[in-house]
Design a protein with these regions (language model features):
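Acidic (Asp/Glu-rich) sequence patches and key acidic residues
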Residues: 1-135
Length: 135
């Protein structure tokens, strides 16, 4: 049984994209190769790739359906935590009431890179019912 991870993309520039990619390379599992393309990046997210565009349209909605809690799900969440940190995404969340995977991902990311939004993201994921972060 899987669930859906979702987010809303905000408009950002190349410098922000490059900073986020650098951080994502640090925080995701190194076994998941990041493919750089002219239009953006992709990395393996289980049964599909998780992609981030270099030049997104304002308000693009994204989602990734998962099949259970495979390890790649945490990497998608880590990438979204970085995207919220860098101002690239907002309203990140999922349709499951248990936020432990988000909280664990947040802790792992914060151990590897400095997060100015750490307190806000942690407070969000501890709320009940869950609300979207980065609004």
């Amino acid at each position: 049984m899987g669930y859906e991870i979702f987010w809303t993309i905000k408009k950002y520039d190349d410098a922000t994209f490059d900073r986020a990619v650098e951080m994502i390379r640090i925080v995701i599992d190194h076994r998941h190769k990041i493919d750089e393309k002219k239009w953006g990046i992709c990395f393996d997210a289980g049964h599909e790739n998780f992609c981030i565009q270099r030049n997104p349209l304002e308000g693009t909605y994204g989602s990734c359906k998962t099949r259970g809690r495979f390890p790649y799900t945490g990497d998608v969440m880590k990438a979204l935590i970085v995207m919220v940190e860098c101002g690239m995404a907002k309203e990140a969340g999922h349709n499951e009431p248990d936020n432990s995977l988000w909280l664990n991902s947040l802790e792992m990311v914060s151990e590897l890179v400095e997060l100015k939004t750490y307190s806000a993201q942690k407070a969000y994921f501890k709320r009940e019912p869950p609300l979207a972060i980065g609004s």
